[in-house]
Amino acid sequence: MRVLVLGSGVIGTASAYYLARQGHEVVVVDRQNGPALETSFANAGQVSPGYASPWAAPGVPLKAIKWLLQKHAPLAIKATGDVDQYLWMAQMLRNCTAARYAVNKERMVRLSEYSRDCLDELRAETGIAYEGRQLGTTQLFRTQAQVDAAAKDIAVLEASGVPFELLDRDAIARVEPALAGVKHKLAGALRLPNDQTGDCQMFTTKLADMAKALGVEFRFGQNIQRLDAVGDRLNGVWIDGKLETADRYVLALGSYSPQLLKPLGVRAPVYPLKGYSLTVPITNAEMAPTSTILDETYKVAITRFDNRIRVGGMAEIAGFDLSLNPRRRETLEMITADLYPQGGDLSQAEFWTGLRPATPDGTPIVGATAYRNLFLNTGHGTLGWTMACGSGRLLADLIGSKRPQISAEGLDISRYSGKNRELEAAPQPLRT
């Protein structure tokens, strides 16, 4: 079966790889000159299934009001006049209930845990190297209120069977020795020992090479113009003035996916959440992170690669603006200097921004659509790296009429539209 994949970020590349492993003829098309040159280029570097949580959570509306008044806030909103922006925010607010949070988090953790297992299997089978570490993730709490608020997340972790550890100040310093000098600033931490880290762009580039070895064709520098539909099927995709045809089509264009879907009458509530990162050269390895930490106050992750520290976070709801805001750099530098003052040279840091494709409920859109040969793999928000392998493998199974290893319940676009045309003959999943 010939499959045309639109997008060569970590999601599109993983989709292509797993489709090729099943024997399909795969072509990947992207406007960039290589894989992982947009959102996947310089993210925070975390593969953190246990921290897979929706931004839409109880208490977030009140927190958001406070954040908007803070200098180093994790969230900023810039009105664009775009109706989609207001609709997306309204949908997000509707998901800020305890009941919806629990449902959405379970879906996210389910896919993220599976994806981590797929990554482990891939690494064991192929030896793919991407400066990865399997040393866990530590969420730092600066206040007792944050420690107490973690109870709802711990309940979900327990229900999902995800191992975790609650740490006091001294235990934090044992896990991350470089934090010993600043432990007085911390009230506690939640550690997930099974979480991982790695350079997403490096991983995607190497996975693309592995996909090519399986016969996948990558076409870079291509202008994807529109989808062409006849009845309930796609007839092809117009690319640089030419209609490209296939048996199945996968849309993995992140924040840009809705633009192609709207003319078909498909509304995918995916909106860009602008994020920022710093890549800092390490000057003192003993004073740098051992693995990765997440500062709960600022929603910023600090991750160790081989000779670099990646600091990533923030969420700006500002449309498709890709300008670099110096105030965000100031925030990232402040947090890094506060926790790891001797770890790296901030004066030599590389500043970057990207657009995370976010859904209002936090769960990505993976699966079939009302068009029988069109499949979506988009809307992963801040968790594209975490969910990439699992999303790609799940989608390949759905396209190939294979039995998925996890339940796909609640992952496709039908949860928004009420329409679902997944493969009618698809068998029930083995693993729930």
From Swiss-Prot:
Cellular component annotations (GO), alphabetically ordered: cytoplasm; plasma membrane
Record field: transmembrane: none
Cofactor(s) required for function per UniProt: FAD
A GO biological-process term: D-alanine catabolic process
Gene3D superfamilies: D-Amino Acid Oxidase, subunit A, domain 2, FAD/NAD(P)-binding domain
Catalytic activity entry: a D-alpha-amino acid + A + H2O = a 2-oxocarboxylate + AH2 + NH4(+)
Enzyme Commission (EC) number: 1.4.99.-
UniProt-recorded Gene Ontology molecular function terms: D-amino-acid dehydrogenase activity
Pfam families from the UniProt entry: DAO (PF01266)
Keywords, alphabetical: FAD, Flavoprotein, Oxidoreductase
Keyword Nucleotidyltransferase: no
Residues where FAD binds: 3-17
First-level EC class: oxidoreductase
Coiled-coil regions listed: none
Pathway linked to the protein: Amino-acid degradation; D-alanine degradation; NH(3) and pyruvate from D-alanine: step 1/1
Protein's UniProt keywords contain Flavoprotein: yes
Physiological role: Oxidative deamination of D-amino acids.
Family of this protein: Belongs to the DadA oxidoreductase family.
PANTHER family listed in its UniProt record: D-AMINO ACID DEHYDROGENASE, SARCOSINE DEHYDROGENASE-RELATED
NCBIfam families recorded: PRK00711.1
Protein name: D-amino acid dehydrogenase
Species of provenance: Ectopseudomonas mendocina (strain ymp)
Gene designation: dadA
